[in-house]
């Protein structure tokens, strides 16, 4: 086989992506993260952020940043060397107390946390039972473990139970892995059923609640709380601090034994530098804001209802979602880009989501709503979507 240059191998791949309307580009932001922003030189209303409560630019978080004088910025080392600061420790304790778990453990990103849990806990011969629409980091974490990955159709509880029954017959340890709120669809996992199945078949449950924390449940405790459920000793929760919290980082919460096992054995935790202590301090402030954000959660609900009512009146095809994530299904990637670009020219930033992020022929506009959006923002979006329907008719709308 001839040796290739990087250019010769990948230039055709990139060209193919461009031709198929699958090429991705990074928007350049030149303003704070708010409902109204400057992106790629345009002044726009942002409907693509995960800043669900409008905390990313909150004065309390900014004030926390200004208290850095008693800290170094960098942590200087991994947690197990000299990088574990008191601010990290306090944040972990406060997150655990908030969720009613014995312990919590910080990670720099949700991706690292999802890799760590599955790589560490699951061994050869075990089964990971995963929803087919789980986030990419959950899929990667399963693939990088030694366990066998068994994916079940989206939200199909009968299919999940059949796999659990087979695993029980073969005496296999199972980990059920699911998003709480699915990031590209906005629908919720039926956690009452999933938790009951986990208990019946003695499986462990790993819940990625990145998009549920802050927005759902009492005090924003997430999808479990939304369904009036509590974690048990075999429940593992992953949450992120960069979405509704408006900060950065992630955590895993669960039992004492779980967290100590991750500290001792999780490679993505052990072999990386700890997040800056100031990030943990800001996240502690964000946690207090989230706990007190009942008014923002109510405003977010009103915004979701406002958008859904208007979109349904227009006859747009919405994915069944009651969360802040409201996908408008278009089907073809080219159509999704066409609509997205037209909206940008009207001062509205709505991202087109295309394969491979979502299945083939399910390209969509992913509208994400925030408590920071006003009724006027949403009306402007609905009017522009109506214009897109006239300008670019689609069989999916």
From Swiss-Prot:
Single GO MF annotation: 8-amino-7-oxononanoate synthase activity
UniProt-annotated binding residues for substrate: 24, 135, 357
Protein name as catalogued: 8-amino-7-oxononanoate synthase
The gene coding this protein: bioF
Reactions that this protein is recorded to catalyse: 6-carboxyhexanoyl-[ACP] + L-alanine + H(+) = (8S)-8-amino-7-oxononanoate + holo-[ACP] + CO2
Xref: HAMAP family: BioF_aminotrans_2
Pathway field: Cofactor biosynthesis; biotin biosynthesis
Function, as annotated: Catalyzes the decarboxylative condensation of pimeloyl-[acyl-carrier protein] and L-alanine to produce 8-amino-7-oxononanoate (AON), [acyl-carrier protein], and carbon dioxide.
Annotated pyridoxal 5'-phosphate binding sites: 110-111, 183, 211, 240
SUPFAM superfamilies noted in UniProt: PLP-dependent transferases
CDD domains according to UniProt: KBL_like
Record-stated family: Belongs to the class-II pyridoxal-phosphate-dependent aminotransferase family. BioF subfamily.
Broad enzyme group: transferase
InterPro entries: Aminotrans_II_pyridoxalP_BS, Aminotransferase_I/II_large, AON_synthase_class-II, AONS_Archaea/Proteobacteria, AONS_Proteobacteria, PyrdxlP-dep_Trfase, PyrdxlP-dep_Trfase_major, PyrdxlP-dep_Trfase_small
NCBIfam families found in the cross-reference section: bioF
Cofactor(s) for this UniProt protein: pyridoxal 5'-phosphate
EC number(s) recorded for this UniProt protein: 2.3.1.47
């Amino acid at each position: 086989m001839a040796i290739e240059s990087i250019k010769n191998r990948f230039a055709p791949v990139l060209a193919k992506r461009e031709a198929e309307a699958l090429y991705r580009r990074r928007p350049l932001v030149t303003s704070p993260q708010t409902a109204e922003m400057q992106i790629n030189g345009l002044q726009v209303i942002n409907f693509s952020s995960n800043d669900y409560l409008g905390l990313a630019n909150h004065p309390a978080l900014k004030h926390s940043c200004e208290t850095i004088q008693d800290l170094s910025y960098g942590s200087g080392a991994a947690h197990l060397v000299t990088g574990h600061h008191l601010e990290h420790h306090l944040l972990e304790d406060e997150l655990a107390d908030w969720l009613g778990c014995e312990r919590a453990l910080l990670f720099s990103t949700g991706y690292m946390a999802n890799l760590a849990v599955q790589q560490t806990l699951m061994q050869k011969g075990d089964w990971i039972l995963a929803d087919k629409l789980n986030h990419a980091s959950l899929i990667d974490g399963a693939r990088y473990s030694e366990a066998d990955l068994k994916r079940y159709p989206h939200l199909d509880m009968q299919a999940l139970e059949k796999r659990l029954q087979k695993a029980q017959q073969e005496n296999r340890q199972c980990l059920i892995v699911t998003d709480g709120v699915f990031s590209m669809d906005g629908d919720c996992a039926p956690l009452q059923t999933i938790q009951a199945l986990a208990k019946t078949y003695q499986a462990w449950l790993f819940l990625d609640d990145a998009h549920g924390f802050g927005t759902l449940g009492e005090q924003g405790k997430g999808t479990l709380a939304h369904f009036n459920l509590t974690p048990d000793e075999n429940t593992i929760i992953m949450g992120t601090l960069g979405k509704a919290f408006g900060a950065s980082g992630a955590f895993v919460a669960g039992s004492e034994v779980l967290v100590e096992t991750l500290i001792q054995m999780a490679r993505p935790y052990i072999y990386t530098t700890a997040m800056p202590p100031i990030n943990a301090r800001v996240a502690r402030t964000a946690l207090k804001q989230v706990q007190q954000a009942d008014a923002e959660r109510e405003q977010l609900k009103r915004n979701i209802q406002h958008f859904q009512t208007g979109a349904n009146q227009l006859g747009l095809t919405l994915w069944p979602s009651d969360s802040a994530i409201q996908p408008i299904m278009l089907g073809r990637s080219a159509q999704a880009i066409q609509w997205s670009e037209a909206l940008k020219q009207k001062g509205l930033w709505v991202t087109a989501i295309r394969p491979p992020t979502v299945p083939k022929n399910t390209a969509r506009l992913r509208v994400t709503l925030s408590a920071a959006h006003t009724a006027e923002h949403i009306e402007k979006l609905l009017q522009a979507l109506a214009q897109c329907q006239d300008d670019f008719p689609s069989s999916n709308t």
